[in-house]
Amino acid sequence: YNMKILVLNCGSSSIKYKLYDMTDHSVMAQGGIEKIGLPGSFLKMTLPDGTKKIIEEDIPEHTKGVQFIFHILTDPELGALKSLEELGAVGHRMVHGGEKFNQSVLLTPEVLEAFTACNDLAPLHNPANLKGVNAVSALLPSIPQVGVFDTAFHQTMPDYAYMYALPYEMYEKYGIRRYGFHGTSHRYVSQRVCEYLGVDPAGKRIITCHVGNGGSISAVKDGKCIDTSMGLTPLEGLMMGTRSGDVDGGAVTFIMDKEGLAPSEMSNLLNKKSGVAGVTGVSSDMREVIAAAHEGNPRCRLALDMYAYRVKKYIGAYAAAMNGVDIILFTGGVGENQADMREAFCNGLDYLGVSLDKAKNNTVRGDEAIISTPDSKVTVCVIPTDEELMIAKDTMALV
């Protein structure tokens, strides 16, 4: 049987890919296409020695994109495969599975129909995910494909955690409730931290903090998600690069009224113009904001304080939801790489039993590590996420 799995993540104008050899989970090839349907589209790939190569190519739509990825994967010089027959299956990141999907599934016509019914909930992402699936079907009709849903891990939340206190018919008519995102990441790191520490997930209360350009926190009890900070859409919860996170609904209607904004314009303000970028007016990139704060920019300092405070509040809330916490872990671009932000997140959590080893924390960048002191009641860890490997493993298990 064929142990090579291709993982695809199709966005509205991009396709990321990673090719795994599942005999040892090694990455054989990786890269991505950007600016699909726009001028200047290109494929960026990482060669086996770690160097990056950019190939410009006109990619008008997703099928052409997938075709070009297949072409590069089997290229005599650049490719990792002799032929596409070496591929065992393709795994897809699917963003919004609604209430229909609580685990990964083999993509059949029936499944795709059910997934299409969730388009309303993720109008940007889901149609792009479908384009990727259809492109693969068109080019390799017989290859098995698997869908791994960003929302699936959170489907174990109890109703009192996922319902909003809106008129109940809003839930009945439109499925308005908390769904949560980054589920594949939260699932991976919550499992991985238990392996890393050599503990059984049963009886463990874990708070997983996926902090990057988008950010979400989950409460994981006995290996199952019981709450998460993102909601119906990825807009709720933490302050993010360009997203507001939690904001008073009354402020939303007030701004729409004062500025004369249509719903789509208001959505754009909340999703693309808010967060760190909105508060600082400088950048959505934490590295730039941290640098500017060190140089004395007051709005960058404010944004960092707000950002860390929001993370800390959610950690406190989820400790309350689980009657305590055993493990807090950080992952994502900021969580894995920004030691000073991790310190800010943990600052003042002594009451919870968190004691950070500051010297150790300062040495950790993108590695698995324990960053709490040996006598800390709560174990604090950094666990780099690997959503693609999780997708590849799920795909292997289903084909």
What are these model-derived regions, one by one?
Residues 221, 227-259, 268, 332-363:
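Catalytic phosphate/nucleotide-handling subdomain of diverse soluble enzymes
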Residues 268, 275-279, 286-321:
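Adenine-nucleotide phosphate-binding core of ATP-dependent small-molecule kinases
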Residues 153-258:
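Glycine-rich phosphate-binding loop of actin/hexokinase-like ATP-binding domains
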Residues 301, 305-326, 335-399:
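Internal helix-turn-beta structural module
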Residues 11, 92-95, 211-213, 325, ...:
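Glycine-rich beta-strand-to-loop/alpha-helix junction loops that act as flexible
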Residues 72-87, 193-200, 315-326:
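Phosphate/pyrophosphate-binding loops at sites that engage ATP/ADP/AMP, CoA/4′-phosphopantetheine
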Residues 1-98:
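N-terminal glycine/serine-rich phosphate-binding loop of ATP-dependent small-molecule kinases
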Residues 73, 77-125, 146, 152-161:
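Short beta-strand-loop/turn "lid" adjacent to the catalytic site in phosphate-handling enzymes
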